[in-house]
Design a protein with these regions (language model features):
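Flexible coil/loop and intrinsically disordered segments
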Residues: 1-402
Length: 404
């Protein structure tokens, strides 16, 4: 287990960062961005700034088999990691770094130059991009692998690649509440870098160089690598409720995905677990899409969850957070580990007497056996039914608000 202070220039050495599916999307708003920017700009060039905890879960080979064309970096010694805690800060860092690179590329003195010819903080832009943003697989460079991103079924994955990193040929890219935050952060940093450059007069380029060096060398993370036997779902729920708290919708998603991992393989095998997990992810993708369709006035997560709770569980109470207390109690590990007896009837067996000599006189008797087995009180089907209902109601919830 690693537990040490490191700047981002070391953190990004031979690592691939991925935000897992149980994580929320990018949740920082203007106030968090202003605080981050002010801390960085006001940091003295010879001082360090403690940025907080970064908890990583190293991934095993079997957890990366679906990465396809991106596996080449793993095969070349890169260490794939899930970000359990600290993803908001790392995402912010990557967005800001990308905007610094884009700004320097666009300066008049760099027009027509390749990334090999443009320097920033004693490094070429080509070196910076390959260290912090993406690598192209040699020799042809057809495959581009990003060093930071989201699970592929997360709408933010495509948005990050095409709208934040500006990779061309995106086609249609879905937008959500979280991608709106990514867009805001990108524009926020682009504008502030431009202002910093202009307000610094003749020292504008040096000011941007200093910003880059402070960003990569002076922001210190407390790196913590989580052991294999550590419960990352519980860790995520605990850690991410300390700073900008998880919404109830985010908390519930993490809880349901966590529960899918607890069933015995004999009852619910890996393919079933993967299918249910995908169904949960697809449902949350649809829910966030419906709630965020009106980008200027997105619908409330809490109002939606409460409304669905009343419909699905036929509750009429509307006091405070009754609904989330009920849901987190209903969908808990206790419901899986506690067993309930179930009576199972086996098929009847036909028994033919050995004494029979005439086929017409064959005496057939049937014996029935009954067996009691222990099963989890909370069955996978119950989770699936709830998730399906949540997805269906998200659309009608939107329609109801449109007609108000």
């Amino acid at each position: 287990m690693a537990n040490e202070l490191q700047p981002l220039s070391l953190l990004f050495q031979n690592r691939l960062f991925l935000i897992p599916d149980y994580q929320r999307g990018y949740a920082w708003l203007q106030q968090q961005l202003v605080d981050f920017w002010d801390d960085l700009v006001n940091l003295q060039a010879d001082r360090y700034h403690y940025t907080g905890l970064l908890s990583l879960k190293p991934l095993k080979c079997k957890e990366t088999v679906s990465w396809g064309e991106d596996l080449w970096l793993v095969e070349n010694g890169y260490k794939p990691c899930h970000i359990v805690d600290g993803q908001q800060r790392i995402t912010t860092f990557v967005i800001l770094l990308n905007e610094i690179v884009g700004f320097v590329r666009g300066l008049n003195e760099n027009k027509g130059k390749s990334d090999k010819e443009i320097t920033l903080g004693y490094e070429t832009v080509e070196e910076i991009v390959s260290k912090y943003i993406c690598r192209k697989r040699p020799p042809n460079g057809v495959v581009t692998t990003y060093l930071f991103g989201y699970e592929v079924d997360n709408p933010s994955a495509e948005y990050m690649k095409y709208k934040v990193f500006d990779e061309p040929y995106s086609g249609a890219v879905n937008e959500t509440y979280y991608t709106k935050n990514l867009k805001f952060a990108k524009n926020f940093f682009a504008e502030n870098i431009r202002k910093l450059y202009e307000e610094s007069g003749e020292g504008g380029l040096e000011a941007v160089n200093t910003l880059y060096k402070k960003l990569t060398q002076r922001l210190m993370f407390n790196l913590h690598e989580i052991d294999d036997d550590y419960d990352v779902f519980v860790a995520f729920e605990t850690m991410n409720n300390r700073g900008k708290k998880l919404t109830n919708l985010e908390l519930l998603k993490n809880r349901l995905i966590y529960l899918t991992t607890l069933y015995d393989d004999e009852v619910f095998d890996e393919k079933d677990k993967s299918a249910l997990r995908k169904k949960i992810n697809d449902t949350w993708k649809e829910v966030y899409y419906q709630l965020g369709r009106n980008k200027s006035v997105p619908l409330s997560d809490d109002d939606f969850l409460r409304a669905h709770w009343i419909i699905y569980f036929r509750y009429s109470r509307k006091r405070g957070d009754d609904y989330i207390k009920f849901l987190l109690s209903k969908f808990s590990s206790k419901g899986i580990f506690e067993k309930a007896p179930v009576l199972v009837e086996t098929e009847a067996e036909s028994v033919i007497s050995d004494d029979v000599t005439d086929a017409d006189d064959t005496e057939v008797t049937e014996t029935e056996e009954q067996e009691i087995i222990e099963v989890s009180k909370l069955q996978p089907k119950e989770i699936e039914d709830y998730v399906n209902s949540l997805k269906a109601v998200s659309y009608t919830h939107l329609r109801a608000h449109e007609t108000e």
